[in-house]
Amino acid sequence: PRAYSIAGERGLSYVFTTDDTDTDTHPNTVDIRMTCLNGRTFSVRGESLGGGKVRISRIDHIDVDFSGEYSTLIIIHHDRLGVLAHITRCLSEGYVNIAFMKLFRETKGDRAYSIIEFDGSLPDHMVSRIYENPDVQDVMFIPVKGENENGF
């Protein structure tokens, strides 16, 4: 209920528009297009499933599938040998217990998305540790409410 005032307090600007042309989507779907301070833009599609449950179904133009019920890492990287091993090694060294993990890619050798849902919190240094691999382009951390709030 306070979303608008919180957004204003944090300096976020927003615009709502409707799209009546896309008739193949779930009726409770929202597409969010974001521009970061560094100018990078990306979009996220989410669906309200009812009962307080949501599903994220797209990031940029890649179909994904995760619930937001767990703390989540979204890692955008090049589809190259060893990147996934680097990510899981970092998480293992930080004692992060993976609940669900999915990898999506645009095309072989191009951009890939690793979606990692896990139990508990994320050590403070973990995002910077994952960035140490030169093929990692972006790391976003979405904490579950009540966990550490180091968000992206």
Descriptions of predicted regions:
Residues 1-152:
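A conserved regulatory-domain signal marking ACT and ACT-like small-molecule sensing domains
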